[in-house]
Amino acid sequence: MAEVPELASEMMAYYSGNEDDLFFEADGPKQMKCSFQDLDLCPLDGGIQLRISDHHYSKGFRQAASVVVAMDKLRKMLVPCPQTFQENDLSTFFPFIFEEEPIFFDTWDNEAYVHDAPVRSLNCTLRDSQQKSLVMSGPYELKALHLQGQDMEQQVVFSMSFVQGEESNDKIPVALGLKEKNLYLSCVLKDDKPTLQLESVDPKNYPKKKMEKRFVFNKIEINNKLEFESAQFPNWYISTSQAENMPVFLGGTKGGQDITDFTMQFVSS
């Protein structure tokens, strides 16, 4: 009668007598590990294999058969690792390794997001409703007067930049700089009165999308005419006088003696 050979004492040291165990410890005999890893030599659809031996051992048939059954179970449980491990295979493991967590901001820094935003600008000239043009009067002042012929070259060319502000259907925030000059119209408080001035700026920092509020004007179009309301001082407007050759100023009245309506002429770059 054929008998199942008993395992050598080296292997039996790792054997478990419990039929439900996997029978061998992780650090078992090296030759057994190799036989499990080389699955090409052990097809998964194979059954229990018995070896015939002429030698007799003191161990019982039941123990030896249990070990063989355990080996067969292990063969079928092990899955060979593919030869090439692709990078996209890592995505399979990420949900088990990392846990997604939302990021909350206590404050929202608009400056960080608009600092590098491009600024859209156009070049233009302005005339009040009486067709007076705006020209330089000294280094930091504008005045309004009628120009004709070659004198039209004296009128100021503005670089109108579309900036961040309280934009609505009838109001567009803009900044008014003088073309090729480091000067911008700004509104400040002098002697407790809102005042229009020309302010010198650093050309490395201006224009920018988020201008300081004193530089911002709300451009309002009414009946093909334009008004420029100060964002710093609501209901105060860029104004001219009825008289000739008078300074451009910031006025707090509309429809009276002060002129707050302008027309805009585009100028090629």
Curated annotation (Swiss-Prot):
Tissues expressed in: Expressed in activated monocytes/macrophages (at protein level).
Maturation propeptide residues: 1-116
Residues with site note (Important for interaction with integrin): 171, 179, 181, 190, 204
Principal location class: cytoplasm
Activity regulation behaviour: (Microbial infection) Cleavage by S.pyogenes cysteine protease SpeB promotes its activation independently of CASP1. SpeB-mediated maturation of IL1B plays a dual role depending on infection site: while IL1B inflammatory response prevents bacterial growth during invasive skin infections, it promotes streptococcal infection of the nasopharynx by disrupting colonization resistance mediated by the microbiota.
InterPro entries per the UniProt record, alphabetical: IL-1_CS, IL-1_fam, IL-1_propep, IL1/FGF
PTM (free text): Activation of the IL1B precursor involves a CASP1-catalyzed proteolytic cleavage. Processing and secretion are temporarily associated.
Site ((Microbial infection) Cleavage): 105-106, 115-116
Effect on the protein of changing residue 179 to E: Suppression of integrin binding. Markedly reduced activity
Sequence motif Involved in interaction with TMED10 C-terminus, location on chain: 228-241
GO molecular function: cytokine activity; integrin binding; interleukin-1 receptor binding; protein domain specific binding
PROSITE patterns reported for this sequence: INTERLEUKIN_1 (PS00253)
UniProt-annotated location(s): Cytoplasm, Cytosol; Secreted; Lysosome; Secreted, Extracellular exosome
Induction: By LPS. Transcription and translation induced by M.tuberculosis and a number of different M.tuberculosis components in macrophages; EsxA is the most potent activator tested (at protein level). In pancreatic islets, release is increased by high glucose treatment. In pancreatic islets and macrophages, release is also increased by endocannabinoid anandamide/AEA.
Resulting phenotype, residue 27 to A: Loss of activation by CASP1
Protein keywords: Cytokine, Cytoplasm, Inflammatory response, Lysosome, Mitogen, Pyrogen, Secreted
GO cellular component, one term: extracellular space
Note: The IL1B production occurs in 2 steps, each being controlled by different stimuli. First, inflammatory signals, such as LPS, stimulate the synthesis and promote the accumulation of cytosolic stores of pro-IL1B (priming). Then additional signals are required for inflammasome assembly, leading to CASP1 activation, pro-IL1B processing and eventually secretion of the active cytokine. IL1B processing and secretion are temporarily associated.
Function statement: Potent pro-inflammatory cytokine. Initially discovered as the major endogenous pyrogen, induces prostaglandin synthesis, neutrophil influx and activation, T-cell activation and cytokine production, B-cell activation and antibody production, and fibroblast proliferation and collagen production. Promotes Th17 differentiation of T-cells. Synergizes with IL12/interleukin-12 to induce IFNG synthesis from T-helper 1 (Th1) cells. Plays a role in angiogenesis by inducing VEGF production synergistically with TNF and IL6.
Entries under PANTHER family matching the protein: INTERLEUKIN-1 BETA, INTERLEUKIN-1 FAMILY MEMBER
Family: Belongs to the IL-1 family.
Quaternary state and interactors: Monomer. In its precursor form, weakly interacts with full-length MEFV; the mature cytokine does not interact at all. Interacts with integrins ITGAV:ITGBV and ITGA5:ITGB1; integrin-binding is required for IL1B signaling. Interacts with cargo receptor TMED10; the interaction is direct and is required for the secretion of IL1B mature form. Interacts with HSP90AB1; the interaction facilitates cargo translocation into the ERGIC. Interacts with HSP90B1; the interaction facilitates cargo translocation into the ERGIC.
Entry protein name: Interleukin-1 beta
Native species: Homo sapiens
Origin organism lineage: Eukaryota, Metazoa, Chordata, Craniata, Vertebrata
